From Swiss-Prot:
Protein name: PPP2R1A-PPP2R2A-interacting phosphatase regulator 1
Sites of Phosphothreonine modification: T47, T149
GO cellular component entries: cytoplasm; nuclear body; nucleoplasm; nucleus
Record field: compositional bias (Low complexity): 178-189, 246-257
Gene name of the record: PABIR1
PTM annotation: CHEK1-mediated phosphorylation at Ser-37 negatively regulates its ability to inhibit serine/threonine-protein phosphatase 2A (PP2A) activity. Phosphorylation leads to its release from the PP2A complex and its sequestration by 14-3-3 proteins in the cytoplasm resulting in its inability to translocate to the nucleus, where it otherwise inhibits PP2A.
Family according to the record: Belongs to the FAM122 family.
Consequence of changing V107G: Reduces the inhibition of PP2A activity by PABIR1/FAM122A
Gene Ontology MF: a single term: protein phosphatase 2A binding
Compositionally biased tracts (Polar residues): 259-270
Biased segments, Gly residues type: 15-32
Oligomeric and partner information: Interacts with PPP2CA and PPP2R1A. Interacts (via its N-terminus) with PPP2R2A; the interaction is direct and this interaction inhibits PP2A activity. The CHEK1-mediated Ser-37 phosphorylated form interacts with 14-3-3 proteins.
Keyword Aminoacyl-tRNA synthetase: no
GO terms, biological process: mitotic G2/M transition checkpoint; positive regulation of cell growth; positive regulation of proteasomal ubiquitin-dependent protein catabolic process
Length: 287
């Protein structure tokens, strides 16, 4: 039924259509009836106040909206500019304060660093002076003994002698060293340790006499007798056994004759000749 009503409404000719009042009045006389399904169709006329009221209002709003913005825009930049200036001034003031605080902190840190550097330099100077003061003593030799680490032929200053002495000629240290216990024994000469014998010169004299004995046999009997008498008169001279055995008979005869003894003893002899057991050949020939 509803579809039929819609079809009837659409098939309405344009010449026969009248006002709604007229259609309503002539509804009983064969006119078309109003459809309930489309109530806004009859309201869409040229004289309807809905479109007339809304259209100019929409246009007025569209025209007045930019005008309102145009009135508000010139005032807003002034306010923003003043607030911006105030904000910039505040930022500049804060920047100045921050800069001053940062500068003060930098100055304080620089002063602390310089003070710490000065303290460190002063401490290092004191340490250098303290460490250098005992090292200066090492240049003065305390002990006169030569150092085993020093080379041969170097000179050392001796405080006792007040002169430079070679390291080889220095006496050994009186304090024994554990590393050099046997150096004095090794360096000591064996000649100094052995005492000279008392019989040394006597043995040497006897050896010299025995060496010269073969020459006496060719000098004659008188030379041998005089030498034997001189040896017997001298208690420090030892007579060899060979001469005593070979000339025992001649020595006995010479001792028994007092004339020969007196002649040998009374003859004038120089001190040098008396000291020597030998008599020159000239004196024997003159006798």
């Amino acid at each position: 039924m509803a579809q039929e009503k819609m079809e009837l409404d659409l098939e309405l000719p344009p010449g026969t259509g009248g006002s709604p009042a007229e259609g309503g009045g002539s509804g009983g006389g064969g006119g078309l009836r109003r459809s309930n399904s489309a109530p806004l169709i009859h309201g869409l006329s040229d004289t309807s106040p809905v479109f007339q009221a809304e259209a100019p209002s929409a246009r007025r709003n569209s025209t007045t909206f930019p005008s309102r913005h145009g009135l508000l825009l010139p005032a807003s930049p002034v306010r923003m500019h003043s607030s911006r200036l105030h904000q910039i001034k505040q930022e500049e003031g804060m920047d100045l304060i921050n800069r001053e605080t940062v500068h003060e902190r930098e100055v304080q840190t620089a002063m602390q660093i310089s003070h710490s550097w000065e303290e460190s330099f002063s401490l290092s100077d004191n340490d250098v002076e303290k460490s250098a003061s005992p090292k200066r003593i090492d240049f003065i030799p305390v002990s006169p003994a030569p150092s085993p680490t020093r080379g041969i032929g170097k000179q050392c200053f001796s405080p006792s002698l007040q002169s430079f002495v070679s390291s080889n000629g220095l006496p050994p240290s009186p304090i024994p060293s554990p590393t050099t216990r046997f150096t004095t024994r090794r360096s000591q000469s064996p000649i100094n340790c052995i005492r000279p014998s008392v019989l040394g010169p006597l043995k040497r004299k006897c050896e010299m006499e025995t060496e010269y004995q073969p020459k006496r046999f060719f000098q004659g009997i008188t030379n041998m007798l005089s030498s034997d008498v001189a040896q017997l008169s001298d208690p420090g001279v030892c007579v060899s056994s060979d001469t005593l055995d070979g000339n025992s008979s001649s020595a006995g005869s010479s001792c028994n004759s007092p004339a020969k003894v007196s002649t040998t003893t009374d003859s004038p002899v120089s001190p040098a000749q008396a000291a020597s057991p030998f008599i020159p050949l000239d004196e024997l020939s003159s006798k």
